[in-house]
Amino acid sequence: GVYADGSHAAVAVARMAASEGAAALLVFPPNSMSMGGQLRPDMAIAHFKMIADATDLPLILFQYPASTGLGYPFETMLQIFAEVPSVVAIKDWCNDPMLHERHIKTFQSLPRRVNVLSTHSSWLMASLSMKPAGLLSGAGSVIADLQVELFNAMQRDDLAMARSVNDRIYPLAQAFYRAPFLDMHNRMKECLVLLGRLDQAIVRPPLQKLEEDEIVKLKQALVAAGLQN
């Protein structure tokens, strides 16, 4: 992931990732655009052009909800695709089903197709029913196998199987994405510890380690999902 407030810093991260063997770059919106950047499409285009000029790697645009102040307007994304051909996909977190479907229908039908990768992990089955090209989800660190099963079931229109898999995903989605939302990755780390995939769940301040009662609830969600006895 290329996460930086300034374009020069983003270029440095992109070059470092490329030198270390990255296959693609997920470009986060810079926080410096949060106070009205939607009104300056030239800023977003310039940001992507600088990164694209620094590396030959394919780029994935990370689309945030409009409510965050960091989401790109629809027309701005079309401009980015037209002017920066190394942008090959978006990680779609618009969190608006109507807009999400518009992204899928429009971007995946462009002369130069731009794939939509859903990260609507709290309502993934509904999202996958719209047939995005794939998904890119933090929860995949814990439930990648279930997400792949759900994706494949929706691709072949096997609704019964999709519902069955989604019933297993549901308790963990509810546990991961409840308020406060900022603890979602802390919760995933604790689940990885419970599953024996991590030795410990390290938290970077100002985030704080979860209370024991919440870790117990995460264990219960893992049991409900059939991932732990």
Regions found by a protein language model. Give the residues of each.
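Short, contiguous clusters of charged residues that form electrostatic/catalytic patches at enzyme active sites
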Residues: 12, 46, 75, 98, ...
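Active-site beta->alpha loop and helix N-cap motifs at the rims of alpha/beta catalytic domains
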Residues: 1-71, 208
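C-terminal alpha-helical cap/extension of soluble enzyme domains
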Residues: 139, 143-229
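Catalytic alpha/beta core domains of metabolic enzymes, predominantly
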Residues: 50, 54, 65-173, 180
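Short, electropositive alpha-helical surface patch
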Residues: 15-24, 76-87, 193-195
